[in-house]
């Protein structure tokens, strides 16, 4: 009989997952030391220890269905740029983005509990654990997002070998081959300019009031009279919209056009209105605090681990 205390002791000794510890103990008839060896042989003990390390490298991967009606984007992290270009790591990332596109789940946590698309005998989380053990680095499926459309297209753009990824939803009542090209232009715009919002309606009240207060204080600090401060604030808010709302931004390919004007021109050519309904932009490692270590200290640490 495998007790909870036995599982707890093995988990504390190896850092492996609870179910992995229970399986190992069952396999070894409750022998703690043999169970430790089993976990080490499977690479699970080492993988669990690595899971405490910061994974801020990696890639952003996207998947678009053949009919361009469904798309997904994921961020899959590892510790070094060396592993981020490893064939096994990239293959897993691409499979995960494909799985996300056709799955009913909406979060990375839910996707981890699903059967793996390329081998349904395993869960996604277990496949990742196996690769951690094989490549010797912590990995983390950080986030996923999906878009779908009935009339229009979904497309993606990857920049810098997976450093930045974007998926865009373009709506149009008329099916036209040129829609894919237009959507790609918009996706490239999102990658280049990193807009915070789709349009003015997407700017929440708290953000808007915060920006207004900042501009108001700036204007007063410049010694402007109270009566002109409000006009200055509104002028700066309009500038904020133009910089941070996708449809109001100047098009990076032609600064004479805003994205709205570009879409209007393309709508005339196609003979139907084209609108951007949504976008998702991921940049690998954004928001992750990565510990900076002295190179000599890092080498010494690795040498000590090898003793």
From Swiss-Prot:
SUPFAM superfamilies: Elongation factor Ts (EF-Ts), dimerisation domain, UBA-like
Location within or outside the cell: Cytoplasm
Domain of life: Bacteria
Keyword Cytoplasm: yes
Chief location bin: cytoplasm
Pfam families linked to this entry: EF_TS
Residues in coiled coil: none
Region described as Involved in Mg(2+) ion dislocation from EF-Tu: spans on this chain: 80-83
UniProtKB keywords: Cytoplasm, Elongation factor, Protein biosynthesis
Family: Belongs to the EF-Ts family.
Protein purpose: Associates with the EF-Tu.GDP complex and induces the exchange of GDP to GTP. It remains bound to the aminoacyl-tRNA.EF-Tu.GTP complex up to the GTP hydrolysis stage on the ribosome.
Database matches in PANTHER family: ELONGATION FACTOR TS, ELONGATION FACTOR TS, MITOCHONDRIAL
Name under which the protein is recorded: Elongation factor Ts
Gene source species: Clostridium botulinum (strain 657 / Type Ba4)
Gene assigned in the entry: tsf
């Amino acid at each position: 009989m495998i007790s909870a205390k036995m599982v707890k002791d093995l988990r504390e000794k190896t850092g492996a997952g609870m179910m992995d510890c229970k399986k190992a103990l069952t396999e070894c008839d409750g022998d703690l030391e043999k169970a430790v060896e089993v976990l080490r042989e499977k690479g699970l003990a080492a993988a669990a220890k690595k899971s405490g390390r910061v994974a801020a490298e990696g890639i952003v991967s996207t998947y678009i269905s053949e009919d361009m009606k469904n798309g997904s984007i994921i961020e899959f992290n590892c510790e070094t740029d060396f592993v981020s270009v490893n064939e096994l790591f990239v293959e897993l990332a691409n499979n995960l983005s494909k799985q996300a596109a056709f799955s009913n789940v909406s979060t990375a946590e839910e996707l981890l509990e699903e059967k793996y698309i390329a081998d349904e005998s395993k869960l996604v989380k277990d496949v990742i654990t196996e690769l951690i053990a094989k490549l010797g680095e912590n990995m983390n499926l950080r986030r996923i997002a999906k878009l779908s459309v009935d009339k229009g297209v979904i497309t993606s753009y990857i920049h810098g070998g997976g450093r930045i990824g974007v998926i865009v939803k373009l709506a149009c009542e008329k099916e036209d081959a040129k829609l894919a090209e237009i959507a790609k232009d918009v996706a490239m715009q999102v990658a280049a300019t990193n807009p915070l919002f789709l349009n003015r309606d997407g700017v929440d009240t708290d953000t808007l009031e915060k920006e207004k207060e900042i501009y108001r204080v700036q204007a007063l600090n410049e010694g402007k009279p109270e009566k002109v401060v409000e006009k200055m604030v509104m002028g700066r808010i309009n500038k904020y919209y133009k910089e941070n709302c996708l449809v109001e931004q100047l098009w990076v390919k032609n600064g004479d056009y805003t994205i709205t004007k570009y879409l209007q021109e393309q709508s005339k050519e196609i003979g139907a209105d084209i609108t951007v309904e949504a976008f998702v932009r991921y940049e690998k490692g954004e928001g992750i605090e990565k510990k900076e270590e002295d190179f000599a200290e890092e080498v010494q640490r690795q040498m000590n681990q090898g003793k």
